[in-house]
Amino acid sequence: MEMEKEFEEIDKAGNWAAIYQDIRHEASDFPCKVAKLPKNKNRNRYRDVSPFDHSRIKLHQEDNDYINASLIKMEEAQRSYILTQGPLPNTCGHFWEMVWEQKSRGVVMLNRIMEKGSLKCAQYWPQQEEKEMVFDDTGLKLTLISEDVKSYYTVRQLELENLTTKETREILHFHYTTWPDFGVPESPASFLNFLFKVRESGSLSLEHGPIVVHCSAGIGRSGTFCLADTCLLLMDKRKDPSSVDIKKVLLEMRRFRMGLIQTADQLRFSYLAVIEGAKFIMGDSSVQDQWKELSREDLDLPPEHVPPPPRPPKRTLEPHNGKCKELFSSHQWVSEETCGDEDSLAREEGRAQSSAMHSVSSMSPDTEVRRRMVGGGLQSAQASVPTEEELSSTEEEHKAHWPSHWKPFLVNVCMATLLATGAYLCYRVCFH
């Protein structure tokens, strides 16, 4: 397959960064005037990730129709997506208003609520304990009907009710839960299986409104999801995988929302996902067998994502740089969620990824041995501290053995005294 050869050549030459920069320079740039209005500042998660004016979703509100979301229409593929940022606490109602007004049936979430100690998205759907949430600002109620937790994703069945008309609709919430922080999955297998589960639900069909896709900024992982889906759809329609140019498709999508695909690594992963998906479409038995294994959805996580070991139980007072965490408010220990321009997005993610890789690689067996030695040393030190009883018994023992300690010294003194006295007496007798 031509695309696979292209991938291998780029990989061998290490040209992903250069190709990514070319895409960035060729990408369209359109005005975002509405997003920059002062009244909309608190509706943007990142100050420099904004929807273009010509493709932004407009809410049916008289006072303010703004939401940080873009409609992406891929004509040949006959596919439409709404890409949006992770909802903020003050925009959760707007998010569900958009879902209602656009008649969307599915929501795809590609991030976790908390990542790297930073809040990436508000909790905009009810959890098991709550069962329902009411959004008074938009007159909507959301109820959790069921939750199906798989090894690398979760599917939630939600009911969205318009409190004014009492009309209800079923919404499917597809939550991919194993995308590594500041990186990409090692293998596209589980990601593609997740994509095909979304397809099978009918949420992407023309019978419904555009599917809503989000991560944190709504451009990186979200762009990867939509790019892979569109390319695979075009391959299937054309019956010629080699005719699909991923770079060209991405540039077309960037006409509707800025910054889709944030890093060179995400671009590389998109190629991998499309190549793997194309093999499945073309009937590659090895790929199909692998996907059958994933489809069993047993309790074991796929090999590409093994979670870190559980953290030890939290101590009452945990020192941090000479301070105790519990003496400070919790927000002081969470990095501030800000984001500069698209360059800084990529740089920040790249730095975090490289530092994460460095920290993982530096966790050598020697490090673990040293940690255990330090722990053992502390335990030994604690064990060697005598108790009060031990101290008192030791003192008594010293008192009991006092004569035995001084006896040799006293004997020597007495002997020396006797010898000196004898010598003196001999001297007196002999010479006087």
From Swiss-Prot:
The active site is at residue 215. The gene is Ptpn1. Ser-50 is the major site of phosphorylation as compared to Ser-242 and Ser-243. Activated by phosphorylation at Ser-50. S-nitrosylation of Cys-215 inactivates the enzyme activity. It is found in: Endoplasmic reticulum membrane. GO terms for biological process: actin cytoskeleton organization; cellular response to angiotensin; cellular response to fibroblast growth factor stimulus; cellular response to hypoxia; cellular response to nerve growth factor stimulus; cellular response to nitric oxide; cellular response to platelet-derived growth factor stimulus; endoplasmic reticulum unfolded protein response. The lineage of its organism: Eukaryota, Metazoa, Chordata, Craniata, Vertebrata. Interacts with EPHA3 (phosphorylated); dephosphorylates EPHA3 and may regulate its trafficking and function. Interacts with MET. Interacts with NCK1. It comes from Mus musculus. This is Tyrosine-protein phosphatase non-receptor type 1. The keyword Phosphoprotein applies. The modification N-acetylmethionine is found at residue 1. Residues 297-322, 335-399 are annotated as: Disordered. One of its GO terms (molecular function) is receptor tyrosine kinase binding. The modification Phosphothreonine is found at residue 367. One of its GO terms (cellular component) is mitochondrial crista. Belongs to the protein-tyrosine phosphatase family. Non-receptor class 1 subfamily. The modification Phosphotyrosine is found at residues 20, 66. Residues 3-277 form the Tyrosine-protein phosphatase domain. PANTHER family: TYROSINE-PROTEIN PHOSPHATASE NON-RECEPTOR TYPE 1, TYROSINE-PROTEIN PHOSPHATASE NON-RECEPTOR TYPE 61F. It comes from the Eukaryota. Tyrosine-protein phosphatase which acts as a regulator of endoplasmic reticulum unfolded protein response. Mediates dephosphorylation of EIF2AK3/PERK; inactivating the protein kinase activity of EIF2AK3/PERK. May play an important role in CKII- and p60c-src-induced signal transduction cascades. May regulate the EFNA5-EPHA3 signaling pathway which modulates cell reorganization and cell-cell repulsion. May also regulate the hepatocyte growth factor receptor signaling pathway through dephosphorylation of MET.
